[in-house]
Each structure stands twice: as structure tokens, then as C-alpha cells.
């Protein structure tokens, strides 16, 4: 996700699925992501607020992501902030009840992929 429109599409897709979701939300503000992450306040996270079992927030703006989710109505006892992606992934996987949904910004997606390759759970090429 990189802007409200992209985030809203992800959120609406998740809202179509039954049950609660365990989420790893990774918000970075690197150049390729865009330094200004205020767009998260324009995304409709409220659509999932009551359907998030647990959210682990990570990335360079992990605290901002958690704050946005709090204001969207996600109870604080369902939120965790872990800026280190590796530690956040460990925490999110350990707390997940089955499937874990990752919602990263662009550079976070690249970092997450590298982390998964390093752990041997993803291939090293895109092909």
C-alpha cells in the first residue's frame, strides 16, 4: 500500500472475507514509499476495526500505524508495536490463529520478502 486508494482496496478485499484477521502492518517512509505517510489517516481502516484479532505494527513508522489503527477503533490490547521487522514477523506469526495477512508499504514488502527468503520460506527469485 502506498496511498489511501491502494490501502482501501486491500482493506475492502479483507472485509469480504469471513472471520477475524491477524495482520502484520508495516509502514515505512523511505523515498520509494513517499516520506509523507499522512495518507494513512485518509484510508478507511475503520472497515476492519472490529474484525482484527491482532495487529503487529512494524517499520520506520510503526507507532504512527498503531495510532491510526487505535483511532480507527481497534482496541489497544489487539495492537503491538515492533519496529524491527524480524522481531515483528516472529511476534505476528506466534500470535496468529492460522493465516497471517501482511499489509506492507513498497519498501517494507521488499524487506519482508528478504526476511522470508533468509528464513527459507520464500524463493530467492521473482520468477
Predicted segments with their positions:
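ATP-dependent carboxylate-amine ligase
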Residues: 1-127
Amino acid at each position: 500500500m502506498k496511498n489511501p486508494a491502494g490501502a482501501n482496496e486491500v482493506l475492502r478485499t479483507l472485509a469480504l472475507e469471513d472471520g477475524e484477521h491477524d495482520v502484520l502492518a508495516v509502514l515505512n517512509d523511505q523515498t520509494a514509499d513517499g516520506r509523507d505517510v499522512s495518507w494513512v489517516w485518509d484510508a478507511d481502516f475503520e472497515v476492519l476495526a472490529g474484525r482484527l484479532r491482532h495487529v503487529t505494527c512494524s517499520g520506520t513508522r510503526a507507532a504512527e500505524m498503531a495510532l491510526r489503527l487505535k483511532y480507527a477503533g481497534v482496541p489497544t490490547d489487539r495492537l503491538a508495536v515492533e519496529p524491527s521487522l524480524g522481531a515483528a514477523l516472529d511476534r505476528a506469526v506466534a500470535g496468529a490463529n492460522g493465516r497471517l495477512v501482511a499489509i506492507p508499504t513498497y519498501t517494507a514488502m521488499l524487506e519482508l520478502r528478504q526476511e522470508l527468503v533468509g528464513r527459507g520460506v520464500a524463493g530467492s527469485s521473482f520468477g
